[in-house]
Amino acid sequence: MISAERVLALAARRGLDAQDLLPEFVREAQKLAIPPTSRFHVGAAALGASGAVYLGVNVELPGLPLNASIHAEQFAVVTAMRAGERALEAIATTAAPCGHCRQFMNELRGAASMRVIIPDGDVGGDRKSHLVLPLCDLLPHSFGPLDLTHDDSLPLLLEERHNGLRFAPGSIPEGSGAAELDRAAAVALAEANAAYAPYSASPAGLVLVDSDGVVHAGRSVESAAYNPTMSPLHTALVAAVGSAGMGDANGGEWRRIESATLVEMNGAPVRYAGTAALILETIAPRASLRVIACEKVA
């Protein structure tokens, strides 16, 4: 994240608007991408209503299907979510967002008018001219949250929500483990309570603990189109890359993950334990996975 104060100072120094800086931030973010399969580095920079800028990169997981990847635009939106940003005004990207990402960003309130900044040809050296388009131009006749929920009062992606969850009785027996694991469970429950799951009513949270004891937390983030949905493990991986620089082209960095704690609802229509186990077995085979049940508060 680049603070609003720093963005404002940079813009003032150069006589630019904050939005004008986004393509430069994209080029810097692009260098940090982790694309071991495609070798195609993608960066994104999203401008929040607060004035802060949130960076994103594409992350590909070696040995796993392509649809296990994290897109740069998703990364930037999740980073904004984790920082408590409540709205995005603009996003710049290395290239025009794919359809997957256009659909994912459509979960934001006012998404149709959010400005998307994309390259539009060279103007000399490494500099490029840019197009600025509202998302609705890139996603005409869109399918979005209201098409499934029919309720404009429901909080959308980035907006505050609390899912009213608690641990299911007996899900954490007394003396069940080390204090670190109990702390991870509490954080995972908090993530599940903040999860964005308006379509399946299956909120979930997950915590990764690395070899330094650092906690990386994630929550499920759904899409009305279903497939662009991010699992809680994927959003936790975003946190791990963003805060600890985890992940590399060879996949060795992921082996720093030592444990994962997943909190999801008993009998939920959508479950994440199987997917999390598959991914962790591939990228962090020594990591343990603990699944804890939660339930709605009566």
Predicted regions and their residues:
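Zinc-dependent deaminase catalytic domain
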Residues: 1-298
